[in-house]
């Protein structure tokens, strides 16, 4: 199954609480942190919600 490499590129300071919670749900809490996640509809929805705070790349690598 394809995977997504998600990297936080901006701070959550001054953002809505829901955006901070979404980043925590993605496993991100500091700028520069990267996670490799399964490409599922729920993960895609979460990445769209905070697209201005993260960088997303499609990949096939294992964790």
UniProtKB/Swiss-Prot annotation:
The keyword NADP does not apply. It holds the Pfam family Ribosomal_L30. Keywords: Ribonucleoprotein, Ribosomal protein. SUPFAM superfamilies: Ribosomal protein L30p/L7e. InterPro entries: Ribo_uL30_ferredoxin-like_sf, Ribosomal_uL30_bac-type, Ribosomal_uL30_ferredoxin-like. GO terms for molecular function: structural constituent of ribosome. Disulfide bonds: none annotated. GO terms for cellular component: cytosolic large ribosomal subunit. GO terms for biological process: translation. Belongs to the universal ribosomal protein uL30 family. This is Large ribosomal subunit protein uL30. The lineage of its organism: Bacteria, Pseudomonadati, Pseudomonadota, Alphaproteobacteria, Acetobacterales.
